[in-house]
Swiss-Prot record:
Signal peptide: none annotated. Keywords: ATP-binding, Glutamine amidotransferase, Ligase, Magnesium, Metal-binding, Nucleotide-binding, Pyrimidine biosynthesis. Homotetramer. The gene is pyrG. Pfam families: GATase (PF00117). Allosterically activated by GTP, when glutamine is the substrate; GTP has no effect on the reaction when ammonia is the substrate. The allosteric effector GTP functions by stabilizing the protein conformation that binds the tetrahedral intermediate(s) formed during glutamine hydrolysis. Inhibited by the product CTP, via allosteric rather than competitive inhibition. Gene3D superfamilies: 3.40.50.880. It comes from Mycoplasma capricolum subsp. capripneumoniae. It comes from the Bacteria. Belongs to the CTP synthase family. This is CTP synthase.
Length: 99
């Protein structure tokens, strides 16, 4: 389990109701930070960072209703009666979008 620092007012920080996420990780791939500014300039938001190693953990596209991608694995800590905040937020977005 690693601590991911969540950007204030990001969707993911609202879902977790926190400025950090504690989730399991399995790093085989990393985002190449040399592309960060280019991708930010076209609307990608880097909303979660593992600060100890400056690793991008969460990205969002704020212009879309729900677009969150994570390097951590929320499925490892979800349980049938206790889903992680990312899963709950995703299901809620689906329901609200289909009204």
């Amino acid at each position: 389990t690693m601590v991911t620092k969540l950007e204030k007012d990001s969707l993911v920080s609202k879902l977790y109701n926190s400025d950090v996420a504690l989730e399991r990780h399995r790093h085989r791939y990393e985002f190449n930070n040399k592309y960060k500014k280019d991708l930010e300039s076209v609307g990608l938001r880097f909303s979660g960072i593992y600060e100890e190693k400056n690793l991008v953990e969460v990205i969002e596209i704020p212009s879309l209703k729900f677009f969150v991608a994570s390097q951590f694995h929320p499925e490892f800590t979800s349980r049938p009666n206790k889903p992680t905040p990312l899963f709950k937020g995703f299901i809620k977005a689906i329901i609200e979008n289909n009204k």
